[in-house]
């Protein structure tokens, strides 16, 4: 009787072990991305097409902001980080690598009668030197300055280009591109900055130094407030087969039409 029980137990153990090994051998086809909220339209469109072209693949995007996305890939929490600014030297020194996916304009939004601002005007508005729209030929109304939170790639890019780092005086610091657009569209005295790829018809994008933000003016460099959309990976850490396949697809010329349709300028 004991011999039969031992044989049965051995068969059960082998069966369970076989099941575990079979499960381990089956690779889950997933791609996880984390980071910039400005890249939502671009990365969402690429992920959707990648899923459609590759049966059984699950693509995820976590819109946490550029700084958090960079940290996530560094800590091994996601496959690919997303940043709407170039990596800093200290980030590169930690073994992080950037690959430029596309270029995006940072649109300056307002809902009043002002249609054009100089780069100098914009800097003075955000540092508090210009406080009223009447100083720029607009209505007698206090300018409500809206921006992104610290760590945002859009904020870093905007402040770097306008040379206003650590000088901006914000009325509100919001956590996503969508929040900036919604807030500015509901207040005629507000001004904000947002990804050109995310600007909707409900918000007016002013021209800067006479140049209207568009795919063409970002591409030819005449629109000065622009920055890269970056895929962030970690050197020495090999991507899964599925994640590598997505990375190769997203950075190929084949993805160019999708990136353009999403409102950005493809790097390739």
Where do the PLM segments sit?
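Bacterial N-terminal signal peptides that target proteins for export
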Residues: 1-11
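C-terminal motif of bacterial Sec signal peptides marking the signal peptidase cleavage site
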Residues: 19-23
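Exported/periplasmic ABC-transporter solute-binding proteins
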Residues: 25-67, 71-78, 83-268
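Core hydrophobic alpha-helical transmembrane segments of single-pass membrane proteins
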Residues: 11-18
């Amino acid at each position: 009787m004991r011999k039969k029980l031992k044989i049965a137990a051995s068969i059960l153990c082998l069966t369970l072990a076989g099941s575990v090994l079979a499960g381990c051998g089956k690779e889950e086809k997933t791609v996880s991305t984390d980071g910039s909220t400005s890249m939502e339209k671009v990365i969402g469109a690429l992920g959707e097409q990648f899923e459609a072209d590759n049966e059984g693949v699950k693509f995820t995007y976590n819109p946490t902001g550029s700084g958090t996305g960079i940290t996530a890939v560094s800590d091994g929490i996601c496959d690919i980080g997303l940043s709407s600014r170039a990596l800093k030297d200290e980030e590169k020194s930690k073994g992080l690598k950037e690959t430029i996916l596309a270029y995006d304009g940072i649109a300056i939004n307002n809902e009043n009668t002002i249609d054009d601002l100089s780069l100098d005007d914009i800097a003075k508005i955000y540092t508090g030197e210009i406080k009223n729209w009447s100083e720029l030929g607009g209505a007698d109304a206090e300018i409500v300055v809206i921006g992104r939170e610290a760590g945002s790639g859009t904020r870093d890019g905007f402040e770097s280009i306008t040379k206003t780092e650590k000088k901006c005086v914000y009325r509100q610091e919001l956590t996503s591109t969508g929040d900036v657009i919604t807030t500015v569209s509901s207040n005629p005295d507000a001004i904000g900055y947002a990804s050109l790829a995310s600007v909707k018809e409900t918000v007016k994008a002013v021209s800067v130094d006479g140049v209207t933000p568009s795919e063409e003016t970002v591409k030819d460099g005449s629109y000065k407030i622009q920055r890269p959309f970056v895929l962030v990976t970690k050197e020495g850490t090999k991507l899964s087969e599925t994640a590598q396949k997505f990375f190769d697809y997203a950075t190929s010329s084949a993805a160019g039409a999708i990136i353009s349709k999403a409102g950005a300028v493809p790097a390739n």
